[in-house]
Amino acid sequence: MGFHIYEIKARQIIDSRGNPTVEADVILEDGTLGRAAVPSGASTGTNEAVELRDGDKSVYMGKGVLKAVENIINIISPELEGMSALNQVEIDRKMLELDGTPNKSKLGANAILAVSMATARAAAEHLGLKVYQYLGTYKANILPTPMCNIINGGAHSDNSVDFQEFMIMPIGAKTFSDAIRMSAEVFHTLKSILSKKGYATSVGDEGGFAPNLKSNEEACEVIMEAIKSAGYTPGTDIAIALDPATSELYDPKTKKYVFKWSTKEELTSQEMVEYWAKWVEKYPIISIEDGMAEEDWDGWKKLTDKIGNKIQLVGDDLFVTNTSFLKKGIEMKVANAILIKVNQIGTLTETFEAVEMAKKAGYTAIVSHRSGETEDTTIADLVVALGTGQIKTGSLSRTDRIAKYNQLLRIEEELGSIAEYHGKDVFYSINK
């Protein structure tokens, strides 16, 4: 048989920002190995599952993860040994039981997720399947429309731009490989435009440029210029997607949004809604993530009522990949899409449940990386397995981001003639 778990190993490794993270090896009785490493975020939702850090300031500035590693070796491994790696749900449930907290603060979501993903990898390897085939079965044939981060601002950079991510989406591409080519061409064109304007072309955490632009609007203007100069039509071939991460701008005391990196302007919730409505009229924006702060549910409702039938409105900090928050959003008719970050919730089973709930309610789902990544490519397989049709995994630079795109290119090749790329049609929450 050989598919039972023989042993689980774990170690502290380094992520793309030089911070420690957890890697786990699940070894089966027949010697099959499944290995996975977990990511971590810079801007985090307050309701996210807890990433266990050691807190010893003299080691890695307190960011060590040896406690999480020990929890895998001393608590999780002895309990999972002998269990079938082919029963992902049972494995994940067992870890949730062992943890016993609502936010995984005892064992750490980073410990639990590493084992959850490594188990799926071991099971797939044992069966001679690719991870996307194992998790998605015969239905896994949709390649995602990528959200490629090309300009960074806010908490991801040191410039005068308030909004965290300006992305492009190649909605007019015919295949995934075309989508990557088009995005790379715009990325390189943007680099030369920024260079000619005298801006720096160094890249941020997620591989996008972080030039010291004069305003938020200028970021959209240079992207439009790059799309056109690369030979594409904005809004038809390539659309703009934003992640302003407004929870980082929101002052809960005054209930105002403070443009702290640029004009120092303060906007009420209603004014922020009007601001986005104007931008959607002015630029070919197809998606806005976290357009309102995570605690501003009223603002979210106003935003959804105002432009939710025109563009994709993604809840990230709002939902933190959690079915209880998503349920509230669905009931209140707030947002129309959810960002799926495996480490926000902590197991593959719960991730599948969140996507299932979103799809049933007519919400779109976008599988996402974090700003602190590794060479692990599980999310590339996951997006195909889940069939969500959208992925957000950074820019067309930095190996930690490119690893995911390259894995998707391999999957597209393997699928051959049954591979599908839906482009603009993935936006079923607005394509009504």
UniProtKB/Swiss-Prot annotation:
One GO MF term: phosphopyruvate hydratase activity
EC code(s) of this entry: 4.2.1.11
GO CC list: cell surface; extracellular region; phosphopyruvate hydratase complex
Entries under InterPro entries matching the protein: Enolase, Enolase-like_C_sf, Enolase-like_N, Enolase_C, Enolase_CS, Enolase_N
GO biological process: glycolytic process
Enzyme class: lyase
Residues annotated to bind (2R)-2-phosphoglycerate: 164, 341, 370-371, 392
Catalytic reaction list: (2R)-2-phosphoglycerate = phosphoenolpyruvate + H2O
Subcellular location: Cytoplasm; Secreted; Cell surface
Binding site for Mg(2+): 243, 289, 316
Gene3D superfamilies: Enolase-like C-terminal domain (3.20.20.120), Enolase-like, N-terminal domain (3.30.390.10)
Active-site residues, as the UniProt record annotates them: 206 (proton donor), 341 (proton acceptor)
Note describing how the cofactor binds: Binds a second Mg(2+) ion via substrate during catalysis.
UniProt name for this protein: Enolase
Organism encoding this protein: Borrelia duttonii (strain Ly)
Organism lineage string: Bacteria, Pseudomonadati, Spirochaetota, Spirochaetia, Spirochaetales
